[in-house]
Regions:
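Conserved substrate/cofactor phosphate-moiety recognition/catalytic segment
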Residues: 54-121, 133-137, 141, 146, ...
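Extreme N-terminal, non-catalytic leader segments
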Residues: 1-42, 66-70, 271-272
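The conserved Walker
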Residues: 49
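Phosphate-binding P-loop
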Residues: 33-39, 143-146, 426-428
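A glycine- and Lys/Arg-enriched "phosphate-lid" helix/loop adjacent to the NTP-binding pocket
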Residues: 91-101, 132-136, 170-230
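NTP-dependent small-molecule kinase module
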Residues: 4, 12, 29-33, 169-172, ...
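Phosphate-coordination/substrate-recognition cap region in phosphate-metabolizing enzymes
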Residues: 155, 163-164, 169, 176-200, ...
Length: 499
């Protein structure tokens, strides 16, 4: 009989340290669970160039796809412009006083809008709704039958006229429209975004001369400033959110509902400041040596050796910047014995920061939401024992590891639900973060940031004794793997079968 948070399998000879039952997942974390199955959403980006709009758009789609199971897509007007006029459009192409170029850019926006509508309403009944000749009664018809569809209309959309056109295009359709404006007055952030455009923007990647590309971008920006109109009370009938200076201030207007509220929370935590995440599994545990899954066993001597190596690495590389000087850094782990023991040698010196007070370096934050996937009645068993005792369960898991749930245990989808709030917090951090975790949990966090579909996460490699460094960027994610201790196939450190 289960008591409190203890495992339903009581301690016994084969499983002396069972894993505790993990915290309950948030059942409302997935689209379609609590929301209207026919709801669709459009998020319209607003703002000057170099304000992080495309970064926000891509991150938003990634978040909704991975954590909420939504079919979400970015419709970038710049892509359609490059298809029409090429990627060498001169700065004066964006001159608001040039009627011909204004018309061309509007045509690009119309093409993006048309494709977004097709994506959102791709069944025949909905296609009739978006037909230009459909009568107004049909515009008030029932919502579509497809759940979790999100379109992100990514462009400057920086005039009231353009936003009125977007509103008119979507008026009467069964879709919620929310405008998202990014405002930044921080010159250092703007300058960094301009310089990043040389390496990440498809408009400038081919330009060999960096200063020439930056000058061209600045001239383009000047043209946009001439016509820029921020969201204001004149558009109070619209639903919108303003993010000012990387989330320092948030202004919300007519935002209602579960998903819009969730998105506002996500956007409020997001910023474009570059930082790195470091992921590592715990050191070798006693159950690793015995080939058992789950449990809550302690480290072996080899595991403690890795913990010492990790502490040295953290001090030299995570807690110091490129110049070798101390920098603020964070540390998370699960609540399980093996991760807490892996963190035990990491130092926590105090940093006196001008204007910020005292910072405790690598202050250890422990989260049960980072605990390993719970194997239920199979906790503490080897895979051979599971296959022998529960052959049908073993076969089901092999067919679909993402959705398979152990009897009285968890699935990868359950872990996704409990990781959602932690990723929200990770997005808000400006400092490097080290997470000491477990294979299944780190597979999911890694997959999210590295850009893998969640269906592929259960097969990704997260080896022992290895640090994975990820540095997310607008169009990519840089990855580096550092092996701190060689894995000896003969001493119990062999990679166990996949959890």
């Amino acid at each position: 009989m289960m008591s409190g948070a203890r495992s339903p399998t009581a301690p016994h000879a084969n499983n002396p340290t069972p894993q505790a039952v993990p915290p309950p997942e948030q059942s409302d974390s997935f689209l379609g669970v609590t929301g209207n199955a026919g709801e669709k959403h459009v998020f319209v980006m607003v703002g000057l160039p170099a304000r992080g709009k495309t970064h926000m758009a891509r991150k938003l789609v990634r978040y909704l796809s991975f954590f909420h199971g939504a079919d979400a897509r970015v419709f970038n007007v710049g892509y359609y412009r490059r298809q029409r006029v090429g990627r060498d459009a001169p700065p004066d192409f964006f001159d608001p006083g040039n009627a011909a170029n204004v018309a061309t850019r509007q045509a690009c926006a119309e093409e993006a809008m048309k494709e977004m509508k097709t994506f959102l309403f791709h069944d025949r009944a909905q296609q009739a709704i978006i037909d230009q000749d459909a009568d107004q009664d049909r515009l008030k018809g029932p919502k579509g039958v497809y759940s979790g569809l999100v379109g992100v209309f990514d462009a400057t959309n920086s005039t009231r006229e353009r936003r009125a056109w977007i509103s008119q295009e979507l008026a009467g359709l069964p879709v919620k429209v929310i405008f998202v404006e990014s405002i930044c007055t921080l010159e250092d952030v703007i300058e960094q975004n301009i310089r990043d455009a040389k390496t990440v923007s498809p408009d400038y990647q081919h330009v060999q001369n960096t200063e020439e590309a930056i000058l061209s971008f600045r001239r383009r920006l000047d043209f946009y400033k001439q016509a820029y109109e921020t969201l204001s009370e004149e558009e109070s009938h619209l639903s919108w959110v303003k993010l000012i200076n990387c989330g320092q201030k948030l202004v919300i207007n007519r935002i209602h509902g579960f998903l819009p509220g969730r998105i506002v929370q996500f956007l409020a935590n997001m910023h474009a400041t570059q930082r790195s995440f470091y992921f590592t599994r715990h050191g070798q545990s006693q159950y690793n040596v015995r080939g058992k899954i789950g449990g809550d066993s302690a480290l072996t001597e080899a595991g403690k050796a890795y913990a010492r190596k990790l502490a040295e690495f953290a001090d030299m590389h995570i807690c110091r910047g490129d110049d070798g000087e101390p920098q603020k850094a964070r540390l998370w782990s699960s609540s399980m014995v093996r991760t807490r023991e892996t963190a035990q040698f990491i130092a926590h010196p105090k940093l006196a920061l001008e204007g910020e007070g005292v910072w405790t370096q690598m202050s250890h934050r422990i989260y049960r939401n980072l605990d390993e996937l719970y194997a239920g009645v199979c906790d503490g068993m080897t895979y051979e024992e599971i296959e022998e005792a529960f052959p049908d369960e073993f076969a089901r898991r092999k067919r679909d590891k993402l959705r398979y749930r152990y009897p009285r245990g968890e699935s990868y989808l359950d872990i996704i639900a409990r990781l959602d709030p932690l990723v929200m917090e990770m997005e808000s951090y400006h400092e490097p973060l080290l997470i000491i975790g477990h294979q299944a949990v780190l597979r999911l966090i890694y997959a999210y940031y590295a850009g893998y579909p969640r269906e592929e996460a259960p097969q990704l490699s997260i080896p022992l004794n290895t640090i994975i460094k990820l540095t997310p960027k607008t169009y990519s994610c840089e990855e580096e793997r550092i092996c701190l201790l060689e894995i000896n196939q003969e001493d119990g450190q062999r990679e166990p079968p996949s959890h």
